Amino acid sequence: MGIQNKDGALYFATGIDNSGLYSGRQEAMGIIKAMAGEITAFDVFGGIGISAGIAFAQAAKGAYEFEKQFQHSMKEVATLSSGIKGSLTDYMNQVVEITRAVPVSANEAAKALYQIVSAGHDGADGMKVLEVSAKAAVGGVTDTATAADAITTLLNAYKLDVSEAENLSDQLFTTVRLGKTSFGELGKSIAQVAPVAAAYGVEIDQVLAAVATLTKQGTPTAQAMTQIRASIIAVSKVLGDGAFDNRTYQEALAEVARQAEGSESKLRELVPEVEAVNAVLGLTGINVKEAAGHLEEMQDATGAAEAAFKEMASSAENQMKLLGNNITAALRPLGKEILKEISSAAQSMNEAFNDGS
């Protein structure tokens, strides 16, 4: 193992074919020069105050660190999916392509993909959910995994096809707009109510409209979910089997309130659970008109997620993230070759240690 000089750059002579690394270096230098040339009319490296060697070293280090971390995260996903394991390079490329249009990091996207695949959405379906979740994360100012958790929870609870992912994202964003909550809060608490609501036949738009109404009144998001869950169970006891078959959740609560005849004590007899009572009071009486209005808007939520994404993606911060993602994607050939070289060398050394033991 020695050191060789080639075109002013040093390489370890390990016996490993590093022609790919050399070509990757040449490609990276071309990319750096092209980008620098767009920025300054001076000498492409001198104009930004660094030498060509320093520029390459910085680019190489960044490309290597990115590829190492990204590969590790995607290999974690591959432990859950034989399909992804068998086409790992292709899926890595697909994830990177998403990040060239959506300002989230590839590593963040890979971590979210792990959650998505874990929730049962693999292959092309998983990638569809990932793209919707990444856009939702940008528009909702949260992380991709949190957005994915909310969307997959609803998909699974209501046994929906992934083609409904975008519609769910629209409804979640409409909840944020109408209520006093955030996408992150919804993502962390929607699982409290979704399975029960689905089991009793209460539709998603009705649940989310109720969340908007209750949180607008000042009820914390997690508590609103608890109230809705408790009221679904309680109302079904009062109205019997099929309580929600021919009426919305909001209409069912209004019927219970009607039976209470305006008496809070009678309401407590019908619905003993405190959280359930609070949901009835928060969605009927003086609040019934607003509750109905929120439900109507929820049923016309199409495009809400895309509008939020476009608004946030245009910010200077997110445009800089996108630029970073595009530069990283362009330098991946260099990062992959360095990682391959170092991994092969490390493997050879480990084998040598094992052989000598």
Language-model segments: residues:
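Extracytoplasmic
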Residues: 7-9
